[in-house]
Amino acid sequence: LLDAIGAPSPEIARRVVGGIRSAAQAWGVPVLGGHTQIGVPSALTVTALGRTDAPVPGGGARRGDDISLTVDLHGRWRPGFEGRQWDSTSTRTGADLRALGSLVAGARPAAAKDVSMAGIVGTAAMLAEASAVGATLEPDSIPAPDGVPFGDWLTCFPGFAMLTADRPGQGRMTSPIARTARIGTATAEPGVRLLWPDGVETDAACPTATGLLPG
């Protein structure tokens, strides 16, 4: 891990560095160094370098593939960010986090993408766009914590969550601390649609989530 930190004061920089240190220890990732500047607006850039013998692409889905969600439903809204950031990680042990982080390598699905600030729907749009396919998601199949507004859950940062795509019935990730469910299908039609239990489809994301179309 390499980081570059800008902070208006040493106190703020120490808080940021402390958070990076705690996260690195929990995940078992060494911090090799970086750059720190005081007296500037707050900014943080982190670069992670790794190696794998079997990389799983973010754009490997094919038409007809199952789209699955693996998500840790444990936790609560991050204070001050209700409806936007779900915190499932700060109360997990390092062993739990490392086990979750190894799921994709063990399952080796055709495609995988961690659910980011774009939320479940937005991340599905990025996976579909990179794969030159579309996606139809079934909201009633999407695992969600009890009592959480479903619209918030579809669009928030959900802590640990991973979208995967694979041939039907293959590549399902399993974990005692996370739920995995098939939530949709990769389609020929670009973009992301929600297929509701009554059969109605609604457009949820356009085909150009990032504008970085393959080819």
Annotated model-derived regions:
Residues 28-35, 108-115, 134-140, 179-186:
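Flexible, glycine/charged-enriched surface loops at secondary-structure junctions
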Residues 47, 158-169, 183:
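Short cationic amphipathic helices and targeting signals
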